[in-house]
Amino acid sequence: MRRLSIVLSCLMALWVTVAHADDKLTGTEISDNNSVWIGLDLGSPHVITKVGWAPSVESQVLSRVVLGVFEGANRPDFMDALPLYMIEEKAMNNKMTYADVNCSRGFRYVRFVKPAGAYQNLAGLEFYGHRGEGNDSHFYQITNLPTVSIHTLNDEIPYDKVHEIVSQLTIISENGTKLLSEPGSIRERGNYSRNFDKKPYRIKFDEKQHVLDAPAKAKKWTLINNYGDKTLMRNLLAFELSRRLGMPYTPYGTAVDVLLNGEYKGCYQLCDQIQVHKNRVNITEMTIHDNEGSALTGGYFIEIDAYADQEKSWFKSVKGNPVTIKSPDEDSITTNQRNYIRSHFNKMEDDPHQYIDKNTFLRHFLVGELSGNTDTYWSVYMYKQRDDDTMFTGPVWDFDLAFDNDNRTYPVCNKKDFIYRSGGSCTGNLKKIVDEFVIRSDESQSLMLDIWDKARHADLTEESLVAYIDQMEAELDHSQQLNFLRWPILNKKVHQNPQALGSFQAEVENVRRFMKERLKWMDKRLGYTFVPTGITEVSAESSESSIDLTQPYDVYSVSGQPSGHSLEGLRPSIYILRQGHATRKMIIR
C-alpha cells in the first residue's frame, strides 16, 4: 500500500490511500474549482469496500464533516455517480475514522463531497477496495427509506420553475437491492414553498418509469420539501385520510432521502405529479384538434388557485375565482378550448348543485376538515370528463399547514365551526360556494353523513389512525435525525408554525393528539354518534306515547335526515322513530 500526498489549492495537505488486495495502485488527484469535492481518478474501475477520513487540525470543528458524502462514478463529470457512504457522526480528533462501504459496483472515479455550508477541510482521506467492474447486486442506501440521488449537467443547481436542467435520476430502494437510474431533468416546483432554503423539486424522466411501488408509469414526479412540517408526515397522513374517505384518486406518496450532486438535501416526499394520466387524473387527454362537438367537451383538468395569476394559462371567473388550466397544457390549449372551460366553470358557479359532483366534493370537504387544513380552499383541483357536464373534485393536495400547524387557526379544535370558514382560508369566492353546496343543502348534509358513517365503521377510527401515525414515526426515525442535522429548525418557528416543540417525537405526539381530538370534534359537528359494530342488542328510549313497531313508522338520523321506514339493514348508530306524534330513540349496535 502506498500513500499519496496531495496538495490542495488551499495548501492543506491531504493523504489519499487506495488499497488493493493484489495490485497497489495510486490515483490522480481530481477536484472541482469551488472546493466542493475532492477525489481520485483510479485509472480503472475498483469496487470500494472501505473509506476513511480525518478533519484537518485547523478546522477546530469536528462536526464539519457530518453529512459529507462519498461517491463513486465511471464518468469524469460524476453524472452517473452513486453514493458510497454518508458520514453521520463527528470524527475523532487527530485520528482517522473508517467505515465499511456496501456497494458492489466498481468505479473509476471516487470523491468526497463536503456537507453544505462547510469548507473542504480534510487532512486525510482514504479509499480501500479491489480492481474490478463489480456487479449490481447491492448499493448503498442512506436509511431504511429509498435514496433519491440526482446529478445535474455541470453541477448546475435548479433555480426556477421554468428551466429544466439535464440530470441523471437515480433511486435506490429495497435495502439497496433495487436500482433505477435513468436520464431526465429537474427544476424547482411549488409556490410559497420555493422560498425555503430546503427547495421543492419536480423531476422528469426522459422515458416513462415505474417508480418504487407507485401505480403510475410516468415521466413526471414531485419531491415535496415538507420544510414547515416537522413531523415530515402531514401530507402522507392526509393522503391516508383521502383513501379512507373514499376519494376516487389519492396521489401516491412516500418518504425518501434526497441527494443533489452529492450533497445531502434531507427527507422529502416523492409523490405523483398531479396530471392527466390513466393512473392519476383519469380523463381524456385533449389534443389541439379537439375544437368542436363532443371532442370540445373534455377532458379538462383545472385548479382553483390563489397563485393562478402567476401561470401562463389561467382565467378569473365571473364570481372572482382564479383558475389555472392544467390540461390541456398551457403550450397546446386552443382558444376554443379555453373559452369552453371558462364558460362551463362560470355555469358551475351559478348553479353548483347542477354541475358539481356531490360525492367527490363532499369527500374532499371531509378530508380538509378532518385534517384541519387551512389551505383546503386555497387550492382546489377539479376535472371534467368528455360528454359529461359534471365537475368532479380532487385530488387532495398540500397539507403542510394541516393538523394544527398554522398559527392563524391554532388550536383548530377550539373553533366551533368548520376550518374553511376561518378568515383567509379560501381564495376568491369559494367560501360562498362551499356554504351553499354543503351547509345549506339538506341533500348534501344527508350524503355527507352517509359517507362519514361508512368511513367511521370501516377504518376511520382513532385506533387505526393512531397506529398509522405510530408506523410512520418509526419509519421516519432514522431519516428525521439526518434531516434535522441538515435543517436544525426543531427549536424554531418556521412558516406558520404555532409552536416549536423541540423534537421530532414531540411534534408527532402533537399530531397524534390532534387526530384523536379532531375525530370527536367532527362527530359532534356533523351531529353523528359513533356506535361500534359487533354488538347486536337494541336498546330503546321512548317518549310518553308508545310506538307500535308492527305498524308503519318513519326512521330519521339524529340530524333529522330521512333513513327509511324500517330498522332492517340500518348501520349501527342512533335513530329517531316517528309514528304520528310519538317518537322513540333507537340505538342499533
Residue ranges and their predicted role:
Residues 133-177:
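N-terminal module-boundary/linker segments of secreted carbohydrate-active enzymes
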Residues 209-210, 225-226, 246-251, 263-366, ...:
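Internal "kinase-insert"/substrate-recognition segments embedded within catalytic cores
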Residues 534-589:
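C-terminal outer-membrane/trafficking sorting elements
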